[in-house]
């Protein structure tokens, strides 16, 4: 990642055009910007231009780590839901023939296809594989169609993944299986604990849609989305 200084004259034009508030708004954002951030990362060929630069706070710029704004390279989707949710059915009508799906459950099955119960070590390995794949694809400059599938929108390194996804304009879909249906299943101890954590978040599609709409309005004001792009994609 390049850390050279942008021409002060270009920076002045960026501030005059787009303002000096952090454009990212990641969890923990300082709001007041102190750094120049490339929408198309410099590593992807992004230029030092008014069109490609926005101001960011140091915290958010470091947290972004060259992840692309969805559509400026890979187009990113996320599907979240409680344990045993039918993730495949939720995505079925939207997947393209070349879509890439990163699913924790699928990775876990691939690691232990002959075991009915995964050990903590295998679950950790699957989680690390998911994180690595998601991180790599989120930085891709190629026009990939990426679907990230998991239950809890958080991890030790990223305690508020949902806010990060919304900041980068991922299309987030919530599977709203009633708690009574999930807890009626023959859940493992780990699944039961995860289900408790999931329902404690009280996530709904309506609430997530409202946050995504507000973010897309902000991106439109920053010249990064057109007015007709601010509505949530139809599922």
Regions found by a protein language model. Give the residues of each.
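Conserved nucleotide-sensing/catalytic segment adjacent to the nucleotide-binding pocket
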Residues: 96-166
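Short, charged surface segments at domain edges that flank catalytic/cofactor-binding sites
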Residues: 1-24, 43, 47, 70-73
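ATP-dependent NMP and nucleoside kinases share a basic, alpha-helical "lid"
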Residues: 110-112, 150-209
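Histidine-centered nuclease catalytic patch
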Residues: 26-55, 68, 104-105
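Pre-Walker A (Motif I) flank of P-loop NTPase domains
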Residues: 72-77, 142-144
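Glycine-rich phosphate-binding P-loop
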Residues: 75-96
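Short metal-binding segments enriched for Cys and/or His
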Residues: 58-70
């Amino acid at each position: 990642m390049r850390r050279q200084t942008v021409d002060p004259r270009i920076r002045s034009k960026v501030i005059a055009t787009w303002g000096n508030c952090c454009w990212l708004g990641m969890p923990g954002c300082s709001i007041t910007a102190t750094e120049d951030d490339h929408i198309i990362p410099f590593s992807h060929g992004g230029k030092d231009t008014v069109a490609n630069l926005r101001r960011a706070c140091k915290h958010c710029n470091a947290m972004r780590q060259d992840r692309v704004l969805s559509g400026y390279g890979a187009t990113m989707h996320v599907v979240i839901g409680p344990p045993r949710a039918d993730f495949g059915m939720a995505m079925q009508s939207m997947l393209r023939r070349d879509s890439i799906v990163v699913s924790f459950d699928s990775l876990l099955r691939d690691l232990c296809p002959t075991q009915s119960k995964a050990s903590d070590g295998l679950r950790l390995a699957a989680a690390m594989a998911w994180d690595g794949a998601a991180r790599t694809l989120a930085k891709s400059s190629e026009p990939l169609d990426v679907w990230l599938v998991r239950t809890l929108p958080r991890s030790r390194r990223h305690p508020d993944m949902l806010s990060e996804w919304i900041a980068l304009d991922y299309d987030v879909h919530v599977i709203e299986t009633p708690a009574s249906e999930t807890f009626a299943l023959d859940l493992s101890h780990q699944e039961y604990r995860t289900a408790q954590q999931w329902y404690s978040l009280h996530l709904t599609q309506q609430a997530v849609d409202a946050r995504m709409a507000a973010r897309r309005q902000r991106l439109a004001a920053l010249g990064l989305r057109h007015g007709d792009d601010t509505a949530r994609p139809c599922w």
